[in-house]
Amino acid sequence: MRGGKQPRRDPDDPRRTLGATGEGLAARHLEARGFEIIDRNFRTRQGELDLVASDARFLVFCEVKTRIAHGEPGPLGPLAAIGVRKRRQVRAMAREWLGARAPDARFDSGSPPEIRFDAIGLTLDAHGRLLALEHLEGAF
């Protein structure tokens, strides 16, 4: 969407449900790897940060893309939807998050860790079961 107001968020929109399912699976994936989820769905003027996580080394801003598999998987997975514009948008949202939330965030080392931008792509079957998860650390 360009400029202006963002469209109203319909809680019954199937895309919203799919996104929430994917974000939950991605959060569990990160937690299983030792990350603490410190924020979810942080709203900014540019959009919404999906997940913010931290461990002793990194503060990770994570973009999550979830798709339903229809037949045979194609050559491009969910992560193909993260183009140049989206990467720029996530960086801008991260700056906004840092200004608003970083002073209140608690980090194990006492100081903020190194910042990293990850991407997690999930493919689900028609019943919402996880078929594939791809996690790109330092994706952009």
Residue spans for each PLM region:
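Acidic-basic catalytic patches of nuclease active cores, encompassing PD-(D/E)XK
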Residues: 1-40
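Short, charged, intrinsically disordered terminal tails
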Residues: 9, 102, 131-135
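Residues at secondary-structure transition points
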Residues: 13, 17, 21, 46, ...
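Conserved catalytic cores of phosphodiester-cleaving nucleases, focusing on short active-site segments
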Residues: 30, 51-71, 90
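Active-site metal-binding core of divalent-cation-utilizing nuclease and nuclease-like domains
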Residues: 36-59
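Catalytic cores of nucleic-acid endonucleases
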Residues: 66-126
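Short, low-complexity, polybasic intrinsically disordered segments
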Residues: 119-140
